[in-house]
């Protein structure tokens, strides 16, 4: 498109970068990639919400590749709605990672070998879709260290669980071995 090519040289070449110009004739936002364009829109939304839409040019990109949070704490668990709001917050603030690993999720930890019940699997799919819509990579984490046996059977159990999560549309994964003792902490095996 000729209108985008006109600004191509002004767009930062760093991943997730964008160029934005606000002038008397309108606003131009051009992203290095899809996420860069999304971030430019977030900057414009922020400026409008603060009533600060003034003539300007912005060339912006992240200095840190991974920006976000791990939900992997002990304590009062987040509700599904809270998780959705967190993902919205991450997207608005140009964070690109949300790692789902709450200690209260039994299928992430104590019952890691078992499949999620259908209703809970749908909630994870919803989180994953929302994250994608907000420019956030959704990582599903598994925490098998409490009772993993360093056997071919448990290796297969782990692979099978990850494949089930892949079947839900999830494409990024983490394997946690923190806060454990016993067999799971014996990495030499």
Please tell me what each predicted stretch does.
Residues 70-189:
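Aromatic-lined carbohydrate-binding surfaces of glycoside hydrolases
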Residues 1-64, 134:
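Contiguous, structured surface segment used for ligand recognition
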